[in-house]
Amino acid sequence: MILLWLVLVSLFSSAEEQTENSFELVDGDRVLFLGGSFFERALDYGHLEMALTLRFSDQDIIFRNIGWDGDTVFGHSRTGGRRRAVFGDAEEGFQRMAKHVRSLEPSVIFLSYGTNESFGGIGEVPRFKKGLHRLIEMLGDSGKVRFVFLSPLPVSPNFIPDPSYYKERHSTLMAYTEALRSVAAQMEYPFVDLIRPLANAEFTTNGLYANSLGYRLIASQVAQQLKLPSPRIESTSSKAEILRAFIIKKNSLYFHRWRPRNDAFVYGERKDEQKIAQTEPAKFESFIVKQETHIREFLKSIAPKTP
């Protein structure tokens, strides 16, 4: 039944849900995934990045995922390491995020926000939109960066026994989704609606976070609504699974590059105790480059460049 739903949704299309023009990635693009739990948990699956890679396999594109559980457009999850009994505030997190993003020099940024902010209620929608505008202006590099907005995921009614609470959560998420759609339209950026197509699918681990099937369906929706070209090979093929494993490993290496487990010794309150620890994250760079080379070589073997 779940697979049938996946097939039906992948075939469903409407002008309302699609961008006016098709979206494309070009040679040399640096694609960034920025947001909260949606993107951090995507690291475990790799479906979205694989879908994009297979559709632009003859282009040399770099992907970086800096999603952070619980993050908001205000940078709440990205505050500095603890200094004695004090954590940094959201503004510090926002500035750290901006600095990190600029260092990566992205040309395309996929944004996933709204879920965490929605717990503030519908009354906080104006503040959310203001924060979103500020984020775009801060990271947009005077129009040089192309953005893609993703809506929040829906909540599953099967995991919420109280119908009234489910109705309230759904209404709130829809309000934040419409805010995202409005800002995207105002700034003329693509918007991908994940609320409506995924509303009735059993695609989550707990009613909130997507599982592997969920991320596969999400990748299908992104491709459909952005009118992406067909993949060079089917995403369910054995070769695609090999590619997905390569992508997951590369993303794991980059995760440890920018978010080391010994954060306190690298960036936080104990960084003066073990200075050698501050040099260790950069050592992941060579492994990341090597893994990306494997990915490009594998793509050439299954999808040679078009003449």
Predicted segments, located by residue:
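Serine-esterase "nucleophile elbow" of acetyl-processing enzymes
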Residues: 6, 13-70, 74, 97-105, ...
